[in-house]
C-alpha cells in the first residue's frame, strides 16, 4: 500500500491560515474553551505547561492521549500537540489521533540528540523552533510547515524570543543582499540547504510562517513580537499562570491583532492582575536551557 504524505504546499497553506493569530497552550477542555472564546486561532494540548515542566524536572514526554482527545472534542479550532524531538512513534500516534499539527518540541525531553524527525514523511504538518536561519532552514528542509522562535519556554521572559526573531530576520536581510555566487558559501556557513538559501534570496523572507514563542507573558510582549516581524504568537505558560486567564487571553489576542495601537494596548494592560512570575535568564543553569535542545 502506497504511503500518503501531505505536500509542502498543502501543509504550508494550513499554517498560513493561522497567520496573525495567537496559539495557546492548554491542559484540559476547560482551558481550551477559554482560549477559543478569547479568540485563539488554535490550541496546543499538553499535559503540563512549560513552567510546570521546568519546575518538575525529570523527563517530559508526549501528553496522555486522553488529554489530547479531550481538547479535540471540546473546541472547533485546530488542535496541536507536542512530540519529543526525534520520537517517531509519538509523532505517528498523534498523527493517527487526527491532531491538526504536531510540534516537534524542545520543551519536551529529546528522544534523539542527533536526528530530528523527517517531517516530510508525515501527512500532518509540523511546527518547529529555531534560533537562527540555519536552524530554521534545516527544519524546513526536513519538512516543517511552520516555525516559531524558541525563546526560553516557561520563563515569562521575552528577551530570548526577541533575540531569536531579530537574529532570523537579520540573517534573511543578509542573504537577500548577497550576490548569487555568495549563496553556496552562505549555505555552508549557516549549515542550511542551498536550495532554501536561494529561495530566501528570491522571496526576501522565509517560505513558511514564523511565530513568536518562548516567554510571552503580557499583551505588550505579544505586540512587541509582532512589531519585530512575527507572523503570530504562541503563548505557553503566560495565560493560565496569570491571575485572570480569560482576561489575559483576550487581551493578548487583541494586542496581537492591533499591535501598533499603543493606546489600546495600554487599556488592555490595565487591571489584568499579576502576570506569571518570571525568571531572569542569568539564573538558569546551562542544563536548564530548553532552547539548546536541538541541532
From Swiss-Prot:
Task of the protein: Catalyzes the formation of pyridoxal 5'-phosphate from ribose 5-phosphate (RBP), glyceraldehyde 3-phosphate (G3P) and ammonia. The ammonia is provided by the PdxT subunit. Can also use ribulose 5-phosphate and dihydroxyacetone phosphate as substrates, resulting from enzyme-catalyzed isomerization of RBP and G3P, respectively.
Catalysed reactions, as listed in the record: aldehydo-D-ribose 5-phosphate + D-glyceraldehyde 3-phosphate + L-glutamine = pyridoxal 5'-phosphate + L-glutamate + phosphate + 3 H2O + H(+)
Protein name, UniProt field: Pyridoxal 5'-phosphate synthase subunit PdxS
Keyword flag Endoplasmic reticulum: no
EC class: lyase
Gene field: pdxS
Pathway(s) per entry: Cofactor biosynthesis; pyridoxal 5'-phosphate biosynthesis
Binding residues for D-ribose 5-phosphate: 25, 154, 215, 236-237
Residues forming the catalytic site: 82 (schiff-base intermediate with d-ribose 5-phosphate)
Keywords (A to Z) from UniProt: Lyase, Pyridoxal phosphate, Schiff base
Highest taxon of the lineage: Bacteria
Record-stated family: Belongs to the PdxS/SNZ family.
Residues annotated as binding D-glyceraldehyde 3-phosphate: 166
InterPro entries in the cross-refs: Aldolase_TIM (IPR013785), PdxS/SNZ (IPR001852), PdxS/SNZ_N (IPR033755), RibuloseP-bd_barrel (IPR011060)
GO biological process, alphabetically ordered: amino acid metabolic process; pyridoxal phosphate biosynthetic process; pyridoxine biosynthetic process
The keyword Metal-binding is annotated on this UniProt entry: no
Pfam families: SOR_SNZ
